[in-house]
Amino acid sequence: MEAYFATFRSPGPELLKVGFFTLRWYGLLIAFAVLIGLNLSNKLASIKGLSKNLINDLLPILVISSIIGARAYYVIFEWRNYSGSNFWSSIQAFGLTISIPTFIKVWQGGIAIHGALLAGTIAILIFCRLKQEDFWDVLDVLIPSVALGQAIGRWGNFFNNEAFGLPTDLPWKLFIPYPYRPEFFLDNNYFHPTFLYESIWNILLFLCLISLIRLSIKGKLKLPSGSLSCVYAIIYSLGRVWIEGLRTDPLCLGGVPPFCIGGIRIAQLISTILFGLGLLGLFWIYQRKKKLPSLGIIGRKHQ
């Protein structure tokens, strides 16, 4: 007997539609993740002794830059789907048909977490310099919320019927409707729920980071500036390299999905680099007993 209780099936990307207004699950999940992250980061910032309202001031810049970065990163590596005859698209609004570049339609999916991390990091760098805050302290305060936000946001992939893995008959398989299946797998009904794998992995990562913070508060562990961010880079990258190998829609360098034959999966490459940087960072902090490079950021003004 098939274990239907463990088979996933998306109800669709839209939660509510009234006239031209559409509330999508993905957008709702991102908003939910941002609110939770704001509350958590403010608490951690208070424990860290950072400036009051620092996170509140940073949040709008961080959210906007991360969304732009996530979309731009995806579009760059998938440009073949947004160029030529695919460059222009149309939307219906206020009874009008409006032509817009296709890459603007972010609500249809197509974002990459590594792009968000890159753009977000740059935004934090600039913000910290302007506010005279220590970059690594601020990043360490934010990083648990990043992990938790990723765990929540991955469910947006579930509702959008995207970012799923290779075909499988495992009890926890994910049903993908025919229109969403890759051309290579049109005859397959069930696929690995890679969104679930990464969501669970990120929850475990979040719990690990919070546990380290608690040990630090109790005086049982020293967490120098940047150490928490290095732990995130190591653990997240380990999971992403494995999970990315299952996906049917990877961003490829020198190849094409679903297998990137003749090329490499970008996410695996970036994750490998981040893993190495994370290890190097922890070695620098705990073995060399040195602070991580300041990256040109001025020290905290209230120290």
Curated annotation (Swiss-Prot):
GO molecular function, one term: phosphatidylglycerol-prolipoprotein diacylglyceryl transferase activity
NCBIfam families: lgt
Assigned keywords, A-Z: Cell inner membrane, Cell membrane, Membrane, Transferase, Transmembrane, Transmembrane helix
Enzyme class: transferase
The protein's annotated pathway: Protein modification; lipoprotein biosynthesis (diacylglyceryl transfer)
Pfam family, one: LGT
KW Transmembrane (keyword) present: yes
Lineage, highest ranks first: Bacteria, Bacillati, Cyanobacteriota, Cyanophyceae, Synechococcales
Organism: Prochlorococcus marinus (strain MIT 9211)
Name this polypeptide is given: Phosphatidylglycerol--prolipoprotein diacylglyceryl transferase
Gene label: lgt
Role description: Catalyzes the transfer of the diacylglyceryl group from phosphatidylglycerol to the sulfhydryl group of the N-terminal cysteine of a prolipoprotein, the first step in the formation of mature lipoproteins.
